[in-house]
Swiss-Prot record:
<comment type="function">
    <text>Catalyzes cis-prenyl chain elongation to produce the polyprenyl backbone of dolichol, a glycosyl carrier-lipid required for the biosynthesis of several classes of glycoprotein.</text>
</comment>
<dbReference type="GO" id="GO:0006486">
    <property type="term" value="P:protein glycosylation"/>
</dbReference>
<dbReference type="GO" id="GO:0004659">
    <property type="term" value="F:prenyltransferase activity"/>
</dbReference>
<protein>
    <recommendedName>
        <fullName>Dehydrodolichyl diphosphate synthase 2</fullName>
        <ecNumber>2.5.1.-</ecNumber>
    </recommendedName>
</protein>
<dbReference type="GO" id="GO:0009570">
    <property type="term" value="C:chloroplast stroma"/>
</dbReference>
<dbReference type="InterPro" id="IPR018520">
    <property type="entry name" value="UPP_synth-like_CS"/>
</dbReference>
<dbReference type="InterPro" id="IPR001441">
    <property type="entry name" value="UPP_synth-like"/>
</dbReference>
<dbReference type="GO" id="GO:0009507">
    <property type="term" value="C:chloroplast"/>
</dbReference>
<dbReference type="InterPro" id="IPR036424">
    <property type="entry name" value="UPP_synth-like_sf"/>
</dbReference>
<dbReference type="GO" id="GO:0009668">
    <property type="term" value="P:plastid membrane organization"/>
</dbReference>
<dbReference type="Pfam" id="PF01255">
    <property type="entry name" value="Prenyltransf"/>
</dbReference>
<comment type="pathway">
    <text>Protein modification; protein glycosylation.</text>
</comment>
<comment type="similarity">
    <text>Belongs to the UPP synthase family.</text>
</comment>
<keyword id="KW-0808">Transferase</keyword>
Length: 310
């Protein structure tokens, strides 16, 4: 999927072009960025293997659970994993590729993680796709990010639905393209009763936004006389947060790729007792081995939730 934090690559510097140039370039590239460039095909062996069929694999969450790797213990698996998918832009820049090649490679990485979550019994996977802070990016970049997201939903959601995956989108939808909103509504409706894995994609989201919209919702309920001010507590706030779409709203484990050591305004309320794991790999390079390493680290920790074990 898309990257949370993508530096503008020097191989395609948006600031160098005038508005007309950007529009022409977008019209020429809007279809091509949704496919791998020839140079990407040459370079993808670094991640997928030149002759590997991995880049053509669809999102799945296999019907049967795969035996866990011997390093992991089923009783210690997290119920909810959240991921900040960072590094698509740098991955592309390092290989002399176009920015959309990095984002498309990021989609391939997400496919693998979704499949592993389904096989290994993880019940919720939340990924940070587009932050409210990302709206300051050049319009052309935002447009192709949303086009990639829309195309991915259209082409993959039937595979996910077939494999009993529920898809939920959280975040401020007021600025999203109408065509994307239609796809989101359809995908959520078709998959709403699926139970094997819930994939939550945060788009136009930030932790601050989530708390703010929750407070506004509570304020409206007070104004309408539904509740008294004295009734406001943590439980009520949690009911208004956008993660109320899942039975397990609090991530057990947060993974951030690319070596950055921060949570970047993601799920600020929900991460209160979450275990954090920072991976050095850029997101397109993050796969099975990195995921196992993160899960092993999680399983070795003692979670006290503010208490003390005797």
């Amino acid at each position: 999927m898309l990257s949370l934090r993508v530096p503008t690559p020097t191989s395609f510097d948006f600031r160098r072009y005038q508005a007309g140039d950007l529009e022409r370039r977008w019209r020429l590239s809007r279809d091509s960025f949704l496919s791998f460039s020839p140079k990407f095909e040459e370079n993808r062996g670094f991640r997928f293997g030149v002759k590997s069929s991995k880049s053509d694999v669809s999102f799945t969450a296999a019907e049967e659970e795969e035996t866990l790797p011997e390093e992991l213990h089923a009783e210690l698996m997290p119920k909810h994993v959240a991921i900040i998918m960072d590094g698509n832009g740098r991955w592309a820049k390092n290989r002399g590729l176009q920015p959309w090649d990095g984002h498309r490679a990021g989609v391939e990485a997400l496919k693998e993680i979704v499949e592993l979550c389904g096989k290994w019994g993880i019940q919720v996977l939340t990924v940070f796709a587009f932050s409210t802070d990302n709206w300051i990016r050049p319009r052309i970049e935002i447009d192709f990010l949303f086009s990639l997201f829309e195309r991915s939903l259209k082409t993959e959601f039937q595979n996910l639905a077939k494999n009993n995956v529920r898809i939920s989108i959280i975040g401020d939808s007021s600025k999203l393209p109408k065509s994307l909103l239609r796809v989101i509504n359809e995908v959520e409706e078709v998959t709403k009763n699926n139970t094997r894995l819930q994939l939550i994609v945060a788009v136009g989201y930030s932790g601050k936004y989530d708390v703010l919209q929750a407070c506004r919702g509570i304020a409206r309920r007070v104004k309408d006389g539904e509740i008294e001010v004295e009734e406001i507590d943590e439980r009520l706030i949690e009911e208004e947060l956008e993660t109320n779409c899942t039975e397990f709203p609090y991530p057990d484990l947060l993974i951030r790729t690319s070596g950055e050591l921060r949570v970047s305004n993601f799920l600020l309320w929900q991460l209160a007792y979450t275990e954090l794991f920072f991976a050095q790999e850029l997101w397109p390079d993050f796969g099975r081995s990195g995921f196992i390493e993160a899960l092993m680290s999680f399983q070795q920790r003692q979670r006290r939730f503010g208490g003390r074990k005797s």
